[in-house]
Regions:
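Short glycine/proline- and aromatic-enriched beta-strand/turn motifs that initiate or cap beta-hairpins
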Residues: 20-69, 234, 238, 250
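Residues on the lipid-exposed face of transmembrane beta-strands in outer-membrane beta-barrel proteins
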Residues: 35, 58-62, 74-76, 117-123, ...
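Predominantly the C-terminal beta-signal and adjacent terminal strand-loop region
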Residues: 180, 186-250
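N-terminal signal peptide c-region/cleavage motif recognized by signal peptidases
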Residues: 14-17
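Extracellular/periplasm-exposed beta-strand and loop segments of Gram-negative cell-envelope proteins
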Residues: 44-49, 81-113, 147-175, 206-214, ...
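Structural signature of outer-membrane beta-barrel domains
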Residues: 40-42, 77-81, 124-126, 143-149, ...
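Residues that define the transmembrane beta-barrel architecture of outer-membrane proteins
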Residues: 29, 52-56, 111-117, 134, ...
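Short loop/turn motifs that connect adjacent beta-strands in outer-membrane beta-barrel proteins
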Residues: 20-30, 66-67, 126-135, 187-195, ...
Length: 250
């Protein structure tokens, strides 16, 4: 029994040493999933409508043996600061309240919601970090940015904010976007601590997708420049290829 335990320990030790040597001394082909969080400040026209926002991020990316980096990223945007002038002004009473169908004062939650999805490409420059697979990560991308105002009135029923009427207030906006990221990409030698962190900028060339704003009784046809500047950080879930058709997640 003791011999078996000794052999098992030696096997695990040799496996760990080999794995660390493989990451430390060679540049790996590395497909991986990323999961992270971002926090951004708006700029341009977006700053006139929303405040700072957070984002939950998920992506699938590949780092080649030559450290080229490419993939697809999806970010879900959310925030609680909305400063759209005159929003719901046509529904307010003289006291500045909104009433539901029963004539009761309705509690409203007005929030930002949106997403951006994009393809990205760039390179890992191994000038810092513990191995050839870590370093300065620089990427650029192109995709779609979308945002709108979320109007939540919970259990209260407000006919003017139901169905097609709601579209007259939500300011749904989207369009082409471009993205830039610079940060640090880290794959540890023991494969246990893998992460990214850095700064990102987004520029969206957007416009309203609603035909009519009911509160202002106007049509919004303006071209917009929506910008986001912020920080991102997240975890890297690696998919290493060990043998033909076999993949392992770390």
């Amino acid at each position: 029994m003791k011999k078996f335990q000794l052999l098992f320990f030696l096997f695990l030790f040799s496996y760990s040493v080999f794995a660390q040597w493989q990451v430390r001394d060679s540049s790996l082909f590395n497909p991986h999933v990323t999961v992270g969080y971002g926090y951004s400040t708006p700029g341009g026209d977006l700053a006139n409508r929303f405040g700072n926002n957070g984002s939950i991020e998920v992506g699938f990316n590949v780092k080649s043996k030559k450290n080229w980096y490419y993939g697809v990223q999806f970010n879900y945007l959310f925030g609680n600061r909305v400063h759209e002038p005159n929003l719901l002004s046509n529904l307010l009473t003289d006291r500045g309240e909104i009433l539901d169908e029963d004539g009761q004062i309705a509690t409203m939650f007005i929030q930002e919601r949106g997403f951006n999805v994009f393809l990205q490409g760039g390179k890992v420059l191994p000038i810092i970090g513990p191995n050839k697979n870590s370093g300065l990560l620089i990427t650029a991308g192109v995709g779609l940015l979308q945002h709108k105002i979320r109007l939540e009135h919970q259990e209260a029923k407000i006919t003017q904010l139901e169905g097609e009427y709601l579209k007259g207030y939500d300011r749904l906006t989207n369009g082409l976007s471009v993205h830039q990221f610079i940060g640090y990409y880290h794959l540890s030698n023991n494969r246990l601590i893998n992460f990214y962190i850095g700064a990102q900028a987004t520029e969206g060339f957007t416009q309203s997708r609603r035909e009519w704003n009911l509160d202002t009784q106007t049509q919004d046809t303006d071209k917009r420049l929506d910008m986001l500047f912020g920080l991102r950080a997240g975890w890297i879930l690696n998919l290493y290829q060990r043998a033909p058709n076999d993949f392992y997640i770390y």
